[in-house]
Regions:
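Boundary/linker segments of alpha-helical solenoid repeat arrays
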Residues: 111-112, 139-152
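TPR repeat positional signature
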Residues: 80, 114-117, 121
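TPR/TPR-like (Sel1-like) alpha-helical repeat modules
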Residues: 122-145, 173
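Bacterial Sec-dependent N-terminal signal peptides
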Residues: 1-24
Length: 211
């Protein structure tokens, strides 16, 4: 999304520091499609939509990284998302809510859609829906936070896309004063964000190269 939402100071106090969990993508794929699994997609998405605060870190990990195995995701290049982005750029927040709800119903763990809805509910003073979606955002960004410590290539934070990387950087309060270097791997790209002696490693997963 070209028009990133820069209101994360509202979100930072909610950003968690949970236990690091090993990322097993094959196991996540298996669990999500197994109707008997506690981590079955339909079961998790029902909780995510209705009671996000009841979801634990392992469930959040399945929801975020499980996006890689879904075929029904909203694409940023699709006409529906472009229409939503245009409404957002025009500050038409009522229309953003209308369009955002439609895309959210199709792809509830889409960070861009959640962020636009958050901004729109903030502008329209809808505290209830704002609080609900901020809980969802916290879950998904915590899943990224718990995927590593970001201190080395081996322990890099892992994201599904470049777009999610920039959202995560905003949540981490990494500004434009950081420089980026990139390294291509067999299963993705590692970006090294550097400011002085501080380095943050973020890996963008390319699952078509893994499986």
């Amino acid at each position: 999304m070209n028009c990133r939402i820069l209101f994360f100071l509202l979100i930072l106090p909610f950003f968690g520091f949970g236990q690091k969990t090993k990322l097993d993508l094959k196991n996540i794929e298996k669990n999500l499609s197994n109707p008997k699994s506690a981590y079955n997609y339909d079961r998790l998405i029902f909780k995510f939509r209705g009671l996000p605060k009841s979801i634990d870190s392992t469930e959040a990990q399945h929801l975020y990284y499980g996006r890689n195995f879904r075929k029904d995701l909203v694409s940023q290049t699709g006409d529906d998302f472009k229409e939503l982005a245009e409404a957002f750029k025009s500050n038409n927040f009522i229309e953003c809510i209308r369009l955002g709800k439609i895309l959210y119903s199709k792809d509830p763990t889409n960070l861009d859609v959640i962020l636009i809805l958050l901004r729109s509910y903030d502008q329209t003073k809808d505290i209830g829906n704002f609080a609900h979606h901020i809980s969802q955002l916290r879950l998904l960004t915590d899943a990224i936070k718990n995927s590593g410590d970001g201190k080395s290539e081996k322990t890099a934070f892992k994201v599904n896309s470049v777009g999610d990387e920039y959202i995560f950087l905003n949540v981490m309060n990494v500004g434009q004063d950081y420089t980026r270097a990139s390294k291509t791997l067999k299963d993705g790209i590692v970006d090294i964000w550097e400011k002085g002696d501080n380095k943050i490693y973020i890996k963008v997963l390319y699952l078509d190269l893994i499986f």
